[in-house]
Every structure is written in structure tokens, then in C-alpha cells.
Amino acid sequence: METLSAWIDRQQAHAARQMLRSISPLGIVKARPGFGQLIHPAPGAVVASPVPASYDPDPDYFFHWYRDSAIVMEALRLLHTAGPVDAGGEPRHALALFGEYVGFNAALRGLDGRRLVAASGEWRTRVAPDFVQYLRPDAELERLHGDAVAADTRVNADGSLDISNWARPQNDGPALRALSILRWMRGAALAGELRTTCEALLREDLRFASEHWRLPCYDLWEEERGLHYFTLRVTAQALEEGADWLAERAAAAARGCRAESQAILATLDGYWLPDRGYYRSRLLESGEPSAKELDIAVVLAALQAGDGSVAHSPRDPRIQATLDALDALFEADYLINRGRPAARGPALGRYRGDRYYSGGAYYFSTLAAAELCFRAATGSGRDALLARGDRYLETVRAFIPESGDMSEQFDQRTGEQTSAKHLAWSYAAFISCAAARRAASGRQGGS
């Protein structure tokens, strides 16, 4: 039987090729006849899935989500050290793709919903009568300029505003984009116009993060409005790393970013629920309790934030306790977790009672659990964490077909793939997890 390490190497190569299909997908044209749209992607767009579905039954993910695209760019950065990355025989340089992404995002700053409203007499006539109910009202579009664009969740792959109703605002996008840019700037030789554009985007994203973190928004699952652990944690990290970058450029701005970051982390300390043994994922704007308090979003936040500190990082015992609680939840809830081989860990979802498509399991959730173990694998508990991480990966291996293709979910009862096909986030999560495993093995002195 193929060893786990050999399978990881083979699957990562496939994940890289498939993820690249979502970056600058210029060869795909997306038709949305109900909205009268024909979308020709622009260079630098990163679609959540390159499959042009239309809820038939798979969801339409042919949009550039700010969050998903930043996560994909972080995975691309991890591949960058290998130089050209294979896209089915045609080398595509990671740095060139990052440059396209930066250019695409810079252009978004000029979007203005007021211009869309002024032209609405023309484009609204192309919308089918039964799709009018899904359109954003003119009053909402009128407010869509400046910072509102940065919180607008997603845009079309051609760089135009999304005219359909959706869960807005979402304030994690600028923070995640800032983290992606900061990390590329530290690890790659950016020069000339690309560096200038990166710095301009970065300043805007840090300002947005500093000014908006106290405001309620929708969560990363786009379902509930409130103050969310994920959004707050990635915002705190963006401001902390941004302060380091600003320190020699604008000392006062650096101090401001660092103070806001520390204020956010102090707020997140209050999300710990000692009687339940986990970090809550949200405080709802309504003040009502949420059934989604225990959520993989907390683990995902720790991974995106990185390893710079202990609190609210993969090495935080409370983050690890939150993963333990999630294990117990999905052990009880998912049929595919019952009677599994001892070499496999539990398949994980998002939260209890998820009703989206099959309601999980999710590849990115189970991979996040593995990555958390690898990132936390230091000190006396290292070997146990490495072994635990491998058990999650064995579960992922069991539910990925021989083709290596990854959807968004695998059914909690049957293990069959469901929801969006070729989800870029699934592939990015695999790449990030594999990199964390290699780093952890290096710390151990193994291979």
C-alpha cells in the first residue's frame, strides 16, 4: 500500500494543478442567463470554483470572494519556493500570478455602485422576471462605494460588482488580503510597480481593519451577523504584522495598529467559555445565543493568524481544547465517523446542525484539524500531535477519489462528494496542511 507520505506528495501535486485553474481563469466564460450576464474573467481573479455551475444542483461559486482568494494566495505562496508551478504541462510562475491578483484587487478600489444605479435602466431590462427577486435594491447599491466595497464579500470574476442579494457586509476580506500581501512581501522579491501597488493596498486594508473591527458583520459562512472570532482574530493578526511593516515607515500608524490589535486580542480572551471548554465562535448582534458557538471557524482563524504568539494560535491550549470539543461533536453526529479504523481520525464539519448541502463533512475542516496538530507539534507532546495529524490525513485520503479531485464536502453519511466541485479552498487547505506536516517533520528530524 502507498505510504501516507507518498500519497501526500502525489495529492499535493494534483491539488496545486487544480487550484491554479481558479486563478486568472481566462479560458472560461460564465453565463448567468437569469441575470442577463456573460462574465469574462479578468487576470488576477480567483474564483472559488472554476466549474460554471448554476445551482443545478451544484452552487454557483464562479465569483472572486475576498476571503477565499486570499486563502488561495497564501497556498500559492507556499508553493512559490519551488519556482514555476505545474498547470497541466504549462508552467505558470507563482509570482506572476500574485502580481495579477494584486492588480485585480487594486482595480476594485474604483468600483462605485452609484454608477451601476445610473445605468440600471439598461442592465435591469436583461434580468429575467423570475430573477428580479434576487437583485440588490438600488438604495443598497447607492451606498456601495469606498469602504463598503471592501466589505462587499465578493465581486464578479470580471471585476464588476455583484448585483445579487447576499450576506453583507463581511469584514474579514481586507484583513486576509493584508496578511497575504505582507507575507508575500516578506518572502518574495517584489519590485517597482508591483511593490508600490502592494503597499497602497496594504495601507488601505490596515486602515479598514483598524476602523471596522468593532462593527458587526456576517461570519465567514455568511449566515449570522455579529462579532465573530474568525474575523476578529485575522484582523488582529493583520494589524500586528502591519504594525511591524509600518514601524520604520510611519511610527505613529504602527503604534495605532498595534494598540488596536492588542485590544482585539483582549476582546477575544472573553470568548473563552470555561464551563464548556472551548472558544465561542461568535457574539450575535441580536444578543441571542447562537447554536453555532462551537465552530471550526475558530481553528481556521488560528491557522490563518499564524504562529507568532501562543495565545489564539495553534499552540494555545484553549485552541487545542476547542478542537477536542469539535472532535467529540462530530464523532457523535457523523455516521462516517462510527466504527472507523483506528488509523483514521474523525471527519469534521463546520458546526452542529449544518444544513448546507449534505451539512458536511468538509475537506477544509478536516485538513485544518490536521494542520493545527502539525503547527502545534513542539515540545514533549510533539510525537502525539504528529500522529494525530496523520490520522486526520488518513481520513481525508479515505474520502478523496483516485482522481485526487476535491469538492467542498463529502457526505457525513455516505462519504460521497457534495456541494461545489473543485473547490479552490479545499485544494489550498491541502497544500497548507502538507507544508505544515513537512515543517513539523523537519523540527522532529524526520522526513
Language-model features, listed with the residues they occupy:
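Extended, well-ordered alpha-helical scaffold segments
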Residues: 4-15, 85-108, 127, 169, ...
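Non-catalytic carbohydrate-binding regions of carbohydrate-active enzymes
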Residues: 2-37, 50, 114, 263-278, ...
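Solvent-exposed loop and edge beta-strand segments that line ligand/cofactor-binding
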Residues: 4, 50-69, 90, 95, ...
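Low-complexity, Ser/Thr/Pro/Gly-enriched N-terminal "stalk/linker" regions
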Residues: 1-67, 100, 104, 108-157
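Aromatic-lined, polymer-binding surfaces characteristic
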Residues: 168-174, 181-185, 195-250, 254-257, ...
